[in-house]
Each structure stands twice: as structure tokens, then as C-alpha cells.
Amino acid sequence: MSNKKNSEILDQLLFGHNLDDETSRVLMKRWLNNEILDVQTGAFLSALRAKGATGMELSCMAEELLNACKLPIDRPDLFMVDTCGTGGDGSNTFNISTAVAFVASACGVNIAKHGNKSASGKVGSADVLSNLGINLNSSLDKVISAIDDIGITFLFAPIWHKSLIKLAPLRKALGIRTIFNQLGPLVNPLRPNAQVLGVASEDLLTPMASALNKMGMDRAIVVHGYGGLDEASLEGDNKIIFVDNGQLKHSILNVSDFNFQNTSNNDLIVSNNQSYENILESVLKGSGQKAHIDVVALNTSLVLWVAGIEKDIEKGFEKALFSMSKAKPWDKFLSLKAYLET
């Protein structure tokens, strides 16, 4: 194990030098073991943000977090997909990736959705699901078995990564995106086989895709949406990296290449007289605004691709629309709610 002092590692970061495998792991272990003072943590997080975390740093730190997270029962022998992204795009859109999780599950994908409450002003996935009656504190056994019995589950991050709870107030006080925003989507305790991961900044595309690849993800799409969304947008060019069996491929996704209607990102913003919960419910029931339903269908089509269910984006889009038109995603939601109640 590296015997570098915390101050030496901090100096390395402040000079813009990347951390090697061992030092990245040591830094995370020290966080987990409460061996870093709060003032040092603030400095580390700021230095890492200024330098920019590499795929190697992210994958090594994520693996240490996962090693510290023990499952109470065996991982289900299923091909699972997560839709957790970095968040923090500041767009005040409704919870698109949360809606996508239920729609994709209704289309036959086993969804292991990892999420948290908001660290900013926006309502996080855990906030909206809790407000709609999902029990975030269900037994861990139940949370895991739900994906086998229902086809979807929700893993509330603080329940699984308790050692990081003490960092939450400091992260909030800093008021900036930190490396933990990037680590969140990488540390799903069920270690899904595939993922659609939205990033709030274009410069996160390559390190996040590289981290997923280094961690052995079978298939993934990392997407930075037009206008700064951390989801695929219906308005313009979406920058994408496909991760497929060890290979990374950069691409551009624009709805003008398909038979989709162009829609402004502004139509996805939650206004003062709307609630995140009502929008999510209406989308899952297929009764929501067309812009909301269409953007969920677009992003669901990406999930269907990584899951190997639908290779054609347009067909995936139509499959998602059909599912919502029959309110099947809402049925999935109600099933999960009932399952986790006890």
C-alpha cells in the first residue's frame, strides 16, 4: 500500500498530475476509514475537480467502494441494466432517467436502478420515488429479490454506502460537482451488466466510458445531451460513447436522423405549478405531455440497445411508446411499491 501522506497526494493533484492505480485506491480507503480530515477532503475534492478525474482514477476508487459494500444475499443471476447518471445538469427537467427505468422494465429489461436524493436544488430519483410511496428503507434482501420477482428494483445509495454519509454535508457545502457525482453511477452494489449513463458535462464522456470499460461493463452508452442535458435530447446533437465488449466508439445521435419529432429542451422543464411526482406518474401512465413521453421513449430506446433487446433505435422508441400507451410502466411502479412495503 502506498505510504504517501495525504498532503503529498494533495500536492500531486494540485500540480495537475494523475494518480496511479495504487494511490487512487489508497485515497478512497482513507476516506472509507475516516483517515482524511474535513478540510483535507474539501481540498481533495476541489483539486480533483480542477484536474479532472481520469477513467483509471474513477474505476479504482469505484472498485474500492464496491469492495466495501457487501451484499446480504447472492446477486441474482440475471442480465441487469442501470440508468443512473451523474445528475447536476442544472436544467430543472423532470426525472427522465427514473421514468426510463420503469418503461424499460415494462419492455422486458431487468432494471437495477441506483439512485440518491438530490444534492442540489433538483429533485433526485429517491426524492420523487419516496414521495410517490416507494419504501427506501425496505430490507436489503427484499431490494435485491425484487429484480428477480418483478423485473425492477431501486437501490437507495446511502443505505448501501453508509461510510460516505458523513461526506454529504461537506459536499453540499462546497456547492460544486465533485468526483462523487461521477462515482455514484459506477458503484451500483448489484454490479449491473450494462448501463445508460448520462453526464452533465461533455468532458465527463471519455473518463466515464473508460471507467465503465475498465470495470468490465459488458455494454454501455454514455451520453451528453444537447444543451447540457444529462440525458439524450430531442432538440439537437447528443454526444455519445458506446462501450461494447471492451471497445469504445464515439458517435452523434440526432433525432433528425430518425422519424422523431424535434422538441425543445424547454418543454422538459418543471414549472412552478407542476410537480415532479405528477409528471412521472402521468408519463408512466402514458397520459403525460407529448414532449415528456417522447424524450422518455428516446432514452428508453438506448436502454433497450444496451440490454440487447432492440438493436434499432426507432423500433426501440416505438416499443417504449406502446408500453406507455398501455400504462405498463405504471403497473411496474405499483408492483415495486407493493413489494417493498414490507
Swiss-Prot record:
Binding, Mg(2+) 1: 97, 231
Acyltransferase recorded as keyword: no
Binding site for 5-phospho-alpha-D-ribose 1-diphosphate: 85, 88-89, 93, 95-98, 113-121, 125
Gene Ontology CC: one annotated term: cytosol
Quaternary structure and partners: Homodimer.
Role noted for this protein: Catalyzes the transfer of the phosphoribosyl group of 5-phosphorylribose-1-pyrophosphate (PRPP) to anthranilate to yield N-(5'-phosphoribosyl)-anthranilate (PRA).
HAMAP family registered for this protein in UniProt: TrpD
Full protein name: Anthranilate phosphoribosyltransferase
Organism: Prochlorococcus marinus (strain MIT 9515)
